[in-house]
C-alpha cells in the first residue's frame, strides 16, 4: 500500500505536474489572464525579496551601485548591434502606438479600444538592457578616469515564451542585470569571473543549490558576447536549469553604442564591457531541487518564516495561557540571529484545527514547526518537527535547549539540503566516450544522467546533435570536470582534452 502524500501526483508519477501542484499548495504563484505572465503571490514574493536582499549586498560589496533604466528601447538601438538583436528578435514585444481611441460597434453596441497614433519609431519592451544602458554609459564616459562603471538594476523584462512554466519560463519575469564598463580587457574579464563566482557562492550558501560552474560553448553563448559563463543546477528529474550567467562582451557593445574614452596616452579607446544576471527562475530551481511529495522544502536562509509555532489548545480554559506562552517564546526566538538576521518566527493563532495548520506549513516548506500545548507548558518542553525530515517525525526538547540551539537547527537543515543535493548530482554525472553511449542515454523519455564527454565539434555539428536528441551542452566545466587526458571527440574523432556536459534541460 502506497503512503499517502500531500501532493498528487508524486514526483515519480508526473514530475512536471508535481511541480505545478507544489507551487499551488505552497500558495507561491499562479498563472494570470495574460498568457505567459504569472502572479507571484506573497509567499513566493517573500522568497524573492530575501534573494534580492542577500544578492544586493553582495553586489554592493563588490563595488556596484543600483540604478534604473527605461523599460522601452528604441528599435534603432537594437539595429546598432545586429548579432545581439537577432538573438532576441523572435522574443520581442513591440510597442507601435501611443494611444487608444474608443470606437462604438454599431452592430453590437459595444465600445472597442482601437490603437491609434502610430509611433514614428517603435519601441521594444526590454528583453535585456545592454543597448539602453550602453547608450547611458556612452554619455557618462569621456576619460579613463570615469572608469570603471559598475551598475545593477532590479527590474522586469519581457520575452515572449511559447511554452510557459511558472518561475522557469514566463513571458514577463523579474531579474537583476548588472552592467559594467572597463578601461582594459583584463579588468572586464576579471569582473565577469568575479560575478560568476558570486552567483556560484550565493546559490550554494543561500539556496543550498550546488551548481556546476562553466563556460558556454560558442553555440550556446549570449548573443553578442565573446564569452558566457554559467552556473548549471541539476534538479530531481536530472534535467539542468541554467541558474545564472555572466558575459564578457569584449568591445562589441561599446563600439555599437560608442562607449569611448580618452586613454592614459590621450588616444580615443573603446571600453570593455560585461553583463550578468539572475532571475526568478532561481525560485523554480529551488522548488525542483529540494521539495518532496508533501510540498515545498525551503532552505532556512530564504524561508519567509523560519519557525512557525502552532498553539495546541484542546480546552478553552488553557487557551489564553498557551497563546501567551507561544507569543513570549516567539519574542525570545526573534531576539536570536541566523546569519546576522533576526529569526523569522510566526505564531499561528488562526481558528483552525492543529492538523490543518500543520499540513499548511508543511506544504509551504517552513523549516521548523513547533507545537505547544498545556502539557508542554507544564514540562517546559516543545514538540519540534523539521521540514528536512518525514512530516510525522517529531522530537520533544526542553524549551531552554530549543532557544539556545534554534540557529544551529536551522543551519543543520540548510546543510542537510545542500549535502543531499550534492550527493544526488554527483551520482548522476558520468563519463561517456562514444556517440552511441550518448544516444542510448538520451533515447528514452525517462530521466537521464548528465554525460561528461570529449568534445571538439563545430557549432553547427553541436546544434544538429542537440536538435536530434533534444539535449544541449550545458557547459564546459571549469576545473577538472572540464579537462581530461587526450581522447577522441565522440562526434568528429579529433583528439581533445576538453570535456563538456550534455543534458536535458528546462
Curated annotation (Swiss-Prot):
State the UniProt keywords alphabetically.
Aminoacyl-tRNA synthetase, ATP-binding, Cytoplasm, Ligase, Nucleotide-binding, Protein biosynthesis
Q: GO terms for CC?
A: aminoacyl-tRNA synthetase multienzyme complex; cytoplasm
| GO biological process per UniProt | prolyl-tRNA aminoacylation
Location comes to: Cytoplasm
**Reaction catalyzed:** tRNA(Pro) + L-proline + ATP = L-prolyl-tRNA(Pro) + AMP + diphosphate
The chain's disulfide connectivity reads none
User: What's the top EC group for this one?
Assistant: ligase
Single Gene Ontology MF annotation: proline-tRNA ligase activity
Where is this protein primarily located?
cytoplasm
Q: Where is the signal peptide?
A: none
Q: What CDD domains does the entry give?
A: ProRS_core_arch_euk
Q: Which PROSITE patterns match?
A: AA_TRNA_LIGASE_II
Origin: domain of life = Bacteria
EC numbers listed for it are 6.1.1.15
Q: Which family does it belong to?
A: Belongs to the class-II aminoacyl-tRNA synthetase family. ProS type 3 subfamily.
Function description: Catalyzes the attachment of proline to tRNA(Pro) in a two-step reaction: proline is first activated by ATP to form Pro-AMP and then transferred to the acceptor end of tRNA(Pro).
Record's HAMAP family? Pro_tRNA_synth_type3
The record's subunit annotation is: Homodimer.
Check the record and name the NCBIfam families matching this protein. proS_fam_I (TIGR00408)
Query: How does the record comment on the protein's domains?
Result: Consists of three domains: the N-terminal catalytic domain, the anticodon-binding domain and the C-terminal extension.
Q: What is this protein called?
A: Proline--tRNA ligase
Amino acid at each position: 500500500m502506497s503512503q499517502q502524500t500531500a501532493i498528487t501526483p508524486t514526483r515519480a508519477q508526473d514530475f512536471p505536474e508535481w511541480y505545478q501542484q507544489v507551487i499551488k499548495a505552497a500558495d507561491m504563484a499562479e498563472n494570470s489572464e495574460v498568457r505567459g505572465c504569472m502572479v507571484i503571490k506573497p509567499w513566493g514574493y517573500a522568497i524573492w525579496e530575501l534573494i534580492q536582499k542577500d544578492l544586493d549586498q553582495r553586489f554592493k560589496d563588490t563595488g556596484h551601485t543600483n540604478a534604473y533604466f527605461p523599460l522601452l528601447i528604441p528599435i534603432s538601438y537594437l539595429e546598432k548591434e545586429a548579432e545581439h538583436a537577432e538573438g532576441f528578435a523572435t522574443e520581442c514585444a513591440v510597442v507601435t502606438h501611443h494611444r487608444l481611441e474608443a470606437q462604438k460597434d454599431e452592430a453590437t453596441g459595444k465600445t472597442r479600444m482601437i490603437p491609434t497614433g502610430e509611433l514614428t519609431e517603435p519601441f521594444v519592451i526590454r528583453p535585456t538592457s545592454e543597448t539602453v544602458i550602453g547608450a547611458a554609459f556612452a554619455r557618462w564616459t569621456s576619460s579613463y578616469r570615469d572608469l570603471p562603471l559598475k551598475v545593477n538594476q532590479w527590474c522586469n523584462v519581457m520575452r515572449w515564451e511559447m511554452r510557459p512554466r511558472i518561475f522557469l519560463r514566463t513571458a514577463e519575469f523579474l531579474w537583476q542585470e548588472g552592467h559594467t564598463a572597463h578601461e582594459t580587457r583584463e579588468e572586464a574579464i576579471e569582473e565577469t569571473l568575479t560575478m560568476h563566482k558570486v552567483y556560484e557562492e550565493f546559490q550554494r550558501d543561500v539556496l543550498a543549490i550546488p551548481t556546476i560552474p562553466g563556460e558556454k560553448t560558442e553555440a550556446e553563448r549570449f548573443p553578442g558576447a565573446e564569452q558566457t559563463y554559467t552556473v548549471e543546477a541539476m534538479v530531481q528529474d536530472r534535467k539542468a536549469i541554467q541558474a545564472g550567467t555572466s558575459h564578457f562582451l569584449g568591445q562589441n557593445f561599446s563600439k555599437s553604442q560608442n562607449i569611448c574614452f580618452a586613454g592614459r596616452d590621450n588616444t580615443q579607446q573603446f571600453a570593455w564591457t560585461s553583463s550578468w544576471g539572475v532571475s526568478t527562475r532561481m525560485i523554480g530551481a529551488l522548488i525542483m531541487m529540494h521539495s518532496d511529495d508533501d510540498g515545498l522544502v525551503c532552505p532556512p536562509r530564504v524561508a519567509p518564516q523560519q519557525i512557525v509555532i502552532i498553539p495546541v489548545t484542546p480546552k478553552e480554559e488553557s487557551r489564553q495561557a498557551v497563546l501567551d506562552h507561544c507569543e513570549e517564546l516567539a519574542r525570545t526566538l526573534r531576539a536570536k540571529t541566523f546569519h546576522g538576521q533576526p529569526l523569522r518566527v510566526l505564531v499561528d493563532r488562526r481558528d483552525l484545527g492543529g492538523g490543518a495548520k500543520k499540513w499548511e506549513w508543511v506544504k509551504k516548506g517552513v523549516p521548523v514547526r513547533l507545537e505547544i500545548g498545556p502539557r508542554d507548558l507544564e514540562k517546559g518542553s516543545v514538540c519540534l518537527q523539521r521540514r528536512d525530515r518525514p512530516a510525522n517525525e517529531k522530537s520533544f526538547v526542553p524549551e531552554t535547549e530549543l532557544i539556545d540551539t534554534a540557529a544551529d537547527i536551522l543551519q543543520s537543515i540548510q546543510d542537510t539540503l545542500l549535502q543531499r543535493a550534492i550527493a544526488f548530482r554527483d551520482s548522476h554525472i558520468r563519463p561517456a566516450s562514444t556517440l552511441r553511449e550518448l544516444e542510448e542515454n538520451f533515447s528514452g523519455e525517462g530521466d537521464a544522467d548528465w554525460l561528461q564527454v570529449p568534445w571538439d565539434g563545430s557549432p553547427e555539428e553541436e546544434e544538429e546533435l542537440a536538435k536530434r536528441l533534444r539535449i544541449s551542452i550545458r557547459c564546459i566545466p571549469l576545473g577538472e570536470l572540464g579537462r581530461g587526458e587526450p581522447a577522441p571527440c565522440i562526434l568528429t574523432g579529433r583528439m581533445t582534452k576538453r570535456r563538456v556536459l550534455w543534458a536535458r534541460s528546462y
